């Protein structure tokens, strides 16, 4: 009976597909990438560094606000993690994880919006090898690391980590990665230092997608993942990210005199990112949780409703997951040309930067000055990965097949009309985003026993352009070649001062302001295939102010900070299907103004020789301070559907940014044992709002006050509470003394190694096993139409959620010598 119901529903949907036009249901890739779950599981603290000897430090931080909230998408002071910069010797580099920072013995200074890393001399020489197991992401990993003095004033710090396996909690998640990081330094007579670094991490991992409350409730699984399905009885994911973006760094420092030091640095990042997804050509979306395939879509057709509901509740994977077998069967029925295929959005990156400058002593202070040049080229195209049993597709714009006006402008590239695309070929779009920056900077630092003062300024010039490699028929005169150059003059100013008011009492203030361009993709109306820029591109403005009080004694540290962060005049471009006009559209949102302010407190107390208590809290308000303005263009002709219509977002909270975050922990270390417990709370969290859904043209569709409230109310997410445990034991072995010999012409030296040891670690995240914590969520920008009596009613389509992991485990064993 169950199979008959499935066949009945399938036949109905096939008939329905034959009557419906092409549906624009693609998720915007750039937007969705932000919500990809890439949480880093931090290992428990390993040893006595957790309760090391106290030293006065004006930069004191418990780090708890950075590390203890992996269960949710955290935004410290309202700044999302993906907007935080990582700087190595003042040059921006891709994200570097905490374990790598510790292994390479990098100096680290963190703030709410950036992490500054500095290559330092080795603090200790050590080699280690370890194995780790985690119940989430890629469970199995092995690692090797070493920090050595090599002779002839060379030193090396390096680590190698390999990860693999399938996630034990979420179906369809698996991956492999190999990470290698190394820093070599060379010194000459205490006046010159050369630093060379390499960071490389080739990886392949599947990702999960957010889904609707209806899907989670029907499956009874908050970890439901619609991105995978079965093919020939084996699990296959449609969303796989493949990355290899190695970064090389070279730094040189030369003490020219007692007063002046020369600093040169350069970075090069060159590699490729690929992200796969299913394509459909003149067919319906294969996404299993699409609103047209859910029981709620058939509310007025009882038989179909119950049949679909039964398939979902019964976890019929032909319906609840991607039916790859059916996709292959559909392709076979269509002959050699594919109806469904798996493609990859590819981005090739070449990013280089050079920074040159000098530091000169001026009395009790010094001044640093110099220049920085940055060039970036991002080549973007679509590549066919798997034709799912077929032999080719024709490189056409299939969204236009049923278009009465533009149905004769189908060619994606007029240079190769009707080209047959096979596996491995580029198709669809091919373009490059180019950016060139040049800037001059100066920093003055003044220091006495009580006062520290930093004043930094930077002015620059920025040139952004697009180059199209395809001549799209729809925009034959404005898709190929180099676009208009968009030019900006960004600048930044930062003032920081700290003062020792009395013994153990510090006061610090920071003031920063900067202007910078919006994201390159948000400067073009249709970056994939059109050189047209948005109207009047403008820079965004960021302002930050904070005042901090710090009290420190050998057994206690308390830091209290008042902060204000204003991000103003931002622009965002997204691509959606506009349900009111029935057009695939390009949406430009201007005047996005955000304000974040609040209080941040961190404290640490050491007692009874071996105990440490820590606590940190943020109480803030993160909101949109003005309404923004939305312009909607048809994707086919760039004609205006809506021009600068007001979006009523004023007063809404920033999405996925807890405005209350509290964490408290207790740790113990003695005789090689380390144990810690942390309790974490995050509240006043809200869903990511849709600006498009709050325009007057949408709100005018409400037929009652209740429906208007449903369209405008921002959903508050459930508060999150977790408890984490960690335990480790270090078994110290005999002390080793190694002698290292150089060539006969060089002297011999002896390097005293610390005691070798075995370290066993165990960690538990979310000890209580809470399964209803929303990791992140966002509102849909689509409408759904219902017929009630003789009129149609529009409601916003269901919001999408991603839930946090339940109880997870981490265990490792490491031998260090």
Would you name each region that the model predicts?
Residues 341, 368-502, 518, 522-528, ...:
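Signature of Gram-negative outer-membrane beta-barrel scaffolds
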Residues 225-247, 251, 433, 483-492, ...:
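Outer-membrane beta-barrel signature, preferentially recognizing the C-terminal barrel domain
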Residues 92-143:
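A beta-strand signature from Gram-negative outer-membrane beta-barrel systems
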Residues 135-164, 169-208, 240-258:
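Transmembrane beta-barrel wall of Gram-negative outer-membrane proteins
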Residues 185, 193-251, 274-343, 406-421, ...:
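Acidic/polar loop-and-plug regions of large Gram-negative outer-membrane beta-barrel proteins
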Residues 7, 22, 613, 681-699, ...:
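C-terminal beta-signal and adjacent terminal beta-strands/loops
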Residues 211, 411-420, 463-474, 485, ...:
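Surface-exposed extracellular loop regions of Gram-negative outer-membrane beta-barrel proteins
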